[in-house]
Amino acid sequence: MKKKIRQILLTLLLFVFSILIISIPTQAAKPAATTVKSKTSYSNSKESMTVRGLDAKKKVVWKYVTKKYTATELPRTKCIVRKDKVYVFESSKIVVLRKKDGKQLWTAKKISPAGHLCKFDKNDNLYITGYYDNNVYKVSTKGKILWKTNTSKANNYWPYKINISGNQMTILYEMNDNDDSSEKTHKIVFNIKNGKILKYS
């Protein structure tokens, strides 16, 4: 008799549980951002940037706002979309967000503070320098600074283009302290594995 009652109670409990499961509404999946828009703002001599991830219907899925930085003649903020990631440069750091939902993946600090010039290699490592910076940085896909090379000995300044071919990277500069001719191409060639300067002109 007791065994039969237990079986009936167990059956009732299973029935009630199944009803509860069915009645719980399923939460609709949040739409993923398919495009990214960024806008730089200036106010009271301060610069900031707002980055938004938009879905297919152009609705805002996520938003990221940088801190406010003292405005200079060079931009201190920049946004680059690379595959499924969004790279936000704000002064001397990079904040990397996941494109679809804006989740912050990693942050790299102590890089070029303004006029950011950058390039990705085939493995998505990031190479960075700045318009007034004598250093070049290699940042991994996880945000680790793999190497930092000082370029002062070349006396080149105002970098404007980065080219990568095989294991070599070439940065082109507008000017050189020892040669003020703007018609000559000034460059530095690096080994991308270790950051060693191979040659310069």
Which positions does each model-derived feature cover?
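Short glycine/acidic-enriched loop and turn motifs that connect beta-strands
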Residues: 43-44, 133-134, 175-181
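Sec-dependent signal peptide cleavage junction
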Residues: 19-33
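Aromatic (tryptophan-biased) beta-strands that constitute blades/sheets of beta-rich domains
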Residues: 38, 53-70, 104-109, 140, ...
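Repeated scaffold domains used in trafficking and secretory/extracellular systems
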Residues: 71-81, 112-121, 154-164
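Conserved blade-register residue in beta-propeller folds
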Residues: 51-53, 96, 136-138, 187-189
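Bacterial N-terminal signal peptides that target proteins for export
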Residues: 2-12
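Short coil/turn segments that connect the beta-strands within blades of beta-propeller domains
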Residues: 83-84, 123-124, 167
